[in-house]
Amino acid sequence: MALNATTGKLAWSYQTVHHDLWDMDMPSQPTLADITVNGKTVPVIYAPAKTGNIFVLDRSNGKLVVPAPEKPVPQGAAKGDYVTKTQPFSDLSFRPEKDLSGADMWGATMFDQLVCRVMFHQLRYEGIFTPPSEQGTLVFPGNLGMFEWGGISVDPNRQVAIANPMALPFVSRLIPRGPGNPMEQPKDAKGSGTEAGIQPQYGVPYGVTLNPFLSPFGLPCKQPAWGYISGLDLKTNKIVWKKRIGTPQDSMPFPMPVPVPFNMGMPMLGGPISTAGNVLFIAATADNYLRAYNMTNGEKLWQGRLPAGGQATPMTYEVNGKQYVVISAGGHGSFGTKMGDYIVAYALPDDAK
């Protein structure tokens, strides 16, 4: 929504998910840019959503600049609830091109791949926006989001943007009220909700559990890739390149002292930054690296090893004519990366050309 900063009155609003039952909120700050549409400069807002949609609206009036038609979605809500018949789907989107199937299930061994396939067929799944159920519903993209709080980075001069979407399925299971899952919050309770277990949802007929769809070994049941780095052309609002980012080096059950030579495409928390030199920087992935890429074609230019998880967005600054890139390497508890309290800065050598 947009508010008049002087009066506080609502100027316009746009709903990206109708009757949200999946935790598909808008996770990150929107990004403002001026783009050229039919030869005219249009002030727009880019709003990345957990669904993978990027909604592009004229920020002066809230009208869509990139179409987002309403399309039919799965029906059949839990008892006492409802689902809308349609949801908006932006034409600028990273959402999966096809629904998951049993053939997409994956594992580090034949055993956990088989278990993942069995679990997949036990869940309700009819594609994106399948309603939550007592049976258990596969939510894909998962409620962690294809986009999270890192958002996207826009280079207004080159009219390009950088995005780092990910694709991890989750399982949503409705828990009927009963012992340990009361309708109302107990009077002596101190707060509500945790990162794991039943989310109480006081006042409605069900609690809910939301968990990543993992194999017995703790790996995603969906085959890789799980994370990408991508470039968008803001003149056309099209995706021009997309590449896997991140290795399993720091997610293995045993230490890997040397770099893993292949990009699997890892889950991420954090965002990219773009610089005037046509270079983007990003950490975020579940392996402990800060990386630099060519913004035009996605070529990896450099990577530096971090002492802990880089689940943060880098920043850049200049001192005495020299540019630095800095990242907070603190790790992330629920993400499983190495914890720390480091601030790490990088710069080119003084004799670099």
Q: How should these model regions be labeled?
A:
Residues M1-K353:
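Beta-sheet-rich non-transmembrane sensory/scaffold domains
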